[in-house]
UniProtKB/Swiss-Prot annotation:
Positions of region (Disordered): 1-42, 87-221
Protein name from the UniProt record: Histone H1.3
Residues with the Phosphothreonine modification: T18
Post-translational modification comment from the UniProt entry: H1 histones are progressively phosphorylated during the cell cycle, becoming maximally phosphorylated during late G2 phase and M phase, and being dephosphorylated sharply thereafter.
Amino acid sequence: MSETAPVAPAAPAPAEKTPVKKKAKKSGVAAGKRKASGPPVSELITKAVAASKERSGVSLAALKKALAAAGYDVEKNNSRIKLGLKSLVSKGTLVQTKGTGASGSFKLNKKAATGEAKPKGKKAGAAKPKKAAGAAKKPKKSTGAATPKKAAKKTPKKVKKPAAAAGTKKVAKSPKKAKAAKPKKPTKSPAKAKAPKPKAAKPKAAKPKATKAKKAVSKKK
């Protein structure tokens, strides 16, 4: 019995540790949401400087007043404001007209503002070639239609074969002419055979004389 008693309190100990981890995760997520909810300091500074109408630029004190009016905690984020000003000056978005570092007056760089606006137009122009590329893809479908044309060109080759057969027919006709030339020689021989026929006709002429002699004999009787 004494051995089973100390085991019971050891079981709830891990159950107490698990909710602590969950709370830590929830608190970390909440802190991340709080940081992500507000805009960055650099954007607030640029908006405040752009809203001012002072030609000489906005001083650090005037900038802090503008940020405080926008609901930004200037006292807690004083170091962030100074770092944001230095980074904006180094990037070229702000121009420091007076002073050095974070102290002094700051003015919005118009060239940088126009330079930022131009790349947006370039991006829009770059989007148009994509549409043109899509239109260029459409003619690829017509290439599929062009393949039947190649097949149509191949079909006349079959028609050329009968032409070759016609050539063979012409060659076959030429021997016929040669055969027709051979019978011309035998035609001369019948002409020679006709020549003796008139000679044989002379004895036939003598037959009537015999008939006349027979008639004369009959008269004498």
